[in-house]
């Protein structure tokens, strides 16, 4: 066992199922092709999974599958709090499961392309193109080229218009999703604002598509359904006008699609004490400590600050809950350092 899922024979799978597990023999693992590549790269630990706190080791064959992808290396992406929160929330749902992926470093990408190994989940080493949704975290504009590279590495058409009903939906969220047009030709949907609540609505919509068997021509119908969810922008459902390369207006193509996309905002941080099980990495990463979010938003209102504008209003986590999260987190992870995260603590 070298990843979050047992990778062996049908007999092993049957034994697991007999003990109450639900790992499916239909699940594909790239591990037999991936393992021989690891001695040839600088940091194999970036690609093997098995971190303490990982909870995507049970495959739910009938659930909507999300591949939460950070378009930068493992060292940068693993500590990302937003990705860890969504990872935990989705895996708590009976109708969904989430796994993680990170952009490979150049040495690993070269090995993967030479061996025809596509982008994969670090949890189960399942190919990215077998997931229903590949969702990217857009933390900064400088990762946009990595987004396109990851889509291509996954074996998915880079341009959204060229994808078929059998291809995953490609989504994006994070701060840069508030300016979606630079990636509108490549991303099927963008999420504006907090993700904790909207992922439930999206899982339901995509789940209905799964239940229908994804018939020919149905991709547009699921995108139409997503476009009706508050906080979700689907570029293919809108006509965007430009005047001499400058944005001049946007118009929905359907009467039931929101003309103006509102951002999603969770009202009370106390209702969302996540992540409860912060991932503990296998190798050195940035921000290698316990992270506890103490509030969102910013009271200062500096006009030059994008984050301060788009994360309003200010929502504070109760001090008692902060203490509880710190105590439980230190005990579980073994960390001896805590970062109290916010925009302006």
Q: How should these model regions be labeled?
A:
Residues 38-67, 74-75, 241-291:
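N-terminal [4Fe-4S]-dependent radical SAM core
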Residues 54, 125, 170-173, 177-180, ...:
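Structured alpha-helical segments in the cores of large, soluble enzyme domains
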Residues 15-43, 93:
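Helix-enriched interaction subdomains in cytosolic or periplasmic regions
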Residues 267-345:
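Radical SAM [4Fe-4S] cluster-binding motif and immediate context
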Residues 90, 134, 138, 147, ...:
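Conserved structural-core and active-site-/substrate-pathway-adjacent residues in large, well-folded domains
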Residues 103-252:
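Glycine-rich beta-alpha loop elements in corrinoid/cobalamin-binding modules
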Residues 66-71, 75-89, 95-104, 109-112, ...:
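Low-complexity, highly charged intrinsically disordered N-terminal segments
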